[in-house]
Every structure is written in structure tokens, then in C-alpha cells.
Amino acid sequence: MDTALYLLPVTLGDTDVEQVLPAYNKEIILGIKHFIVEDVRSARRFLKKVERSIDIDELTFYPLNKHTPHEVVASYLEPLINGHSIGVISEAGCPAVADPGADVVAIAQRKNLKVVPLVGPSSIILSVMGSGFNGQSFAFHGYLPIEPSERIKRIKELESRIYTEHQTQLFIETPYRNHKMMEDIIKTCRPTTKLCIAANITCEGEYIKTKTVKEWKGKLPDINKIPCIFLIYK
């Protein structure tokens, strides 16, 4: 395998690795000794799911989150500069997409280091695929404001975009606040605006359903404490 910064997708939940990741990913992972990870504990657990016999103690982990100083992130690439491949692992899904891993990729690109993204599950892409919404123009906004009036204002702004820019809008909420988010969307958006609720993607109990706001009213699913993406479109 080429010496590179490998972007290693992980499962979105307790799904079997074989169900969502190509066998090629395992080959690459077994050839890497250095990992830049969002969470060391979950990264170790994922690697054991990939190969039970893997010796975790032989591996080196470099923690990366939104608070990691730029100079520390840059120092993590020293093994790669010295000829050793590095893997980047997020807590769930694809690293560097709505994820701190983007910072280390940006530094690697500036240093002209080889970057190789591998195939794996992205809740953003999968939810767009399953929604029936515009897949040529879409935007993911992460978390919306917690403060009620600011949240309502933001939802209205995003709804405006689906009509003026013909762009699918995606956002998330802390799982235990999912129901409140659904209620805010229902009371804020036009009755004809379409809402897709995509929960537990690739996992047991997966739920992906698109209806108009009017059709959702009074018939919201029980997705409390379940990872979910909300999508709106015209």
C-alpha cells in the first residue's frame, strides 16, 4: 500500500463491519500503526471490530477534536513525513466531513502529502439518497441554535433557501431533543414543505420517511435518543 494519510470510515452504530465497509478497508487498516482519532476509546473498539486479533498496544493514537491546537495537529503528521502511513478515524461515519478530521487533511494537503479517502457510510449522503430531495445541491448545517427564538429564525432561513435556491437543507439535534426539533419544524415551516426524518441509518430499526409538514402533524415518530438527520425541501 502507498504511504498516505488514509481517511477511514467507521460504522454509524452497532452494525457489522462487513455490512457497510469493503474488505479493502481492513487490508489498509492492518497496515497502519498510527491513528489520528476523535475518541481513543471508540477508535480502539472499532479496530477490534475490524480484526479481533489486532494488537492495540502496538498502535499509537493521537487525539483530535475541535479544541486541539493547530500546531499539535500539525505535529501528528510527523510519522507520515517520515514514511509511515496514518489513519484518521471519526467517532461515526466518514472522517473530515462535518468532523475535526478536516483540519489534519487541510494541513496534509498544504504539505503536499498523499491523502486517500476510503469508502464507507456517511449519514449525510445516505439521508439525501433516501429522502427523494435534490441531491445536486444540498447543505449540511450541523446543530441549530438551542435558544428557541434563534432556532425558529434559523429554521425559517433554511426553509427560505429551499424555495429560493432549490437546495436541500440538512441539520441535526442532540438525540434527546429530537422530538422538540420535530415540533419546531412542524410549527414553523409551511404545510407544503417536505420533511424527511432519517434515523438510525444503516442500523437496526433504521427509519427514513419523507412527508409534508401537514402530513407529519400529529403523527411524529418516536425517535427520542436516536441519532437522526432532518432534511427539508420543497
Language model features: what each stretch is:
Residues 1-64:
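Glycine-rich, flexible N-terminal cofactor/catalytic loop recognition
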Residues 2-6, 84-85, 164-234:
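A contiguous loop/helix-start segment that scaffolds small-molecule binding in enzyme catalytic cores
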Residues 6, 103-161:
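Class I SAM-dependent methyltransferase SAM-binding "motif I" and its flanking Rossmann-like core
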Residues 12-14, 91-95, 175-176:
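Short glycine-rich anion-binding loops that position phosphate/pyrophosphate groups of nucleotides
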Residues 29-35, 112-116, 168-169:
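Short active-site oxyanion
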Residues 41-43, 93, 123, 177:
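Alpha-helix capping/helix-boundary segments
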Residues 62-69, 144-148:
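Conserved helicase motor
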Residues 65, 73-115:
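Glycine/small-residue-rich loop that forms an oxyanion/phosphate-binding "nest" at active or ligand-binding sites
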